[in-house]
């Protein structure tokens, strides 16, 4: 092997090691417990899989050294945890004052996922982006990917409103335009939006108005809605679901989405299984 080829091989190995380490870790996440992994082996699907995930979401978890969590133990001993809502204010700080905050020298900007751009101090008349702060909501706000008007009564509004897995920072105007419309692929624009990354108009399946996010956010939207439907025992509109399944395939999970899932777990102690195990989408026939 030439010296140049050897150097190239070493460089490739350096970049592959962390990726492979993460891939191995994601295949054995203690959060899900032993029974879940048995379900994976036996091909559990549909209602049974949803019920398994619901139990994982709703139960107390007991941490087990060098093993998977004990799900719903009788009398928890040692280190235990369960889904703990952060509250909506803390959720907004997490997103816009932390995870999506970008440092540029001495200045900060915050990433808007609907226009797919970073908004800096110059874009704000009020409070600008800064660590641990919520910037001017007339410029950027938090989008509830599952609209608040469609929340279930089975769980508290506050739990659903502050669940970080379906929250993203978006341009306030586009947030308002999207409203509670379903997601879809636009065939005829009804409004010229301020940025071309997103579209609003007539959907490909008919006359219903739909909102179409940027290409590199479509898979994120799909997996957020799959999570929310299972977590809170709700159903996704069939027309919307067909598009979401397509987006899940076309915009696969990237490193940022994996890191976000980890950080959300640290903050509220729940994970999105459709990020950890994207193949689960194919095991559920109807969301």
What is each stretch, according to the model?
Residues 1-11:
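Bacterial N-terminal signal peptides that target proteins for export
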Residues 10-18:
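Bacterial N-terminal signal peptides
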Residues 17, 120, 145-148:
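Generic N-terminal helix/loop capping motif
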Residues 21-118, 280-287:
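N-terminal module-boundary/linker segments of secreted carbohydrate-active enzymes
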Residues 108-112, 117-139:
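Short, His- and charge-rich active-site/binding loops that engage polyanionic ligands
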Residues 129-287:
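Domain-level detector of nuclease and nuclease-like folds
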């Amino acid at each position: 092997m030439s010296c140049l080829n050897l150097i190239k091989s070493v460089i490739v190995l350096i970049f592959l090691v962390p990726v492979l380490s993460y891939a191995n870790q994601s295949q054995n996440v203690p959060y899900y417990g032993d029974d879940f992994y048995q379900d994976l082996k036996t091909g559990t699907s549909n209602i049974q899989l949803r019920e398994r995930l619901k139990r994982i979401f709703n139960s107390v978890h007991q941490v087990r050294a060098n093993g998977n969590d004990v799900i719903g133990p009788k009398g928890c001993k040692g280190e235990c945890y369960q889904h703990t809502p952060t509250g909506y204010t803390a959720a907004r700080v997490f997103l816009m004052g932390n995870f999506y905050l970008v440092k540029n020298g001495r200045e900060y900007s915050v990433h808007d996922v609907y226009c797919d751009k970073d908004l800096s101090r110059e874009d704000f008349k009020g409070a600008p982006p800064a660590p641990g702060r919520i910037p001017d909501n007339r410029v950027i706000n938090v989008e509830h990917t599952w609209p608040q008007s469609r929340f279930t009564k089975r769980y508290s509004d506050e739990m659903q409103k502050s669940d970080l897995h379906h929250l993203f920072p978006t341009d306030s105007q586009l947030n308002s335009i999207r409203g509670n419309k379903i997601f879809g692929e636009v065939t005829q624009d009804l409004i010229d939006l301020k940025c071309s990354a997103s579209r609003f108009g007539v959907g490909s399946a008919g006359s219903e108005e739909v909102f179409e996010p940027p290409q590199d956010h479509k898979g994120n939207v799909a997996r957020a809605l799959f999570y929310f439907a299972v977590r809170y025992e709700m159903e996704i509109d069939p027309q919307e679901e067909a598009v979401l399944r397509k987006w899940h395939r076309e915009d696969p999970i990237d490193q940022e989405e994996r890191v976000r899932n980890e950080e959300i777990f640290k903050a509220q102690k729940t994970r999105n299984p459709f990020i950890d195990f994207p193949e689960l989408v194919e095991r559920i026939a109807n969301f």
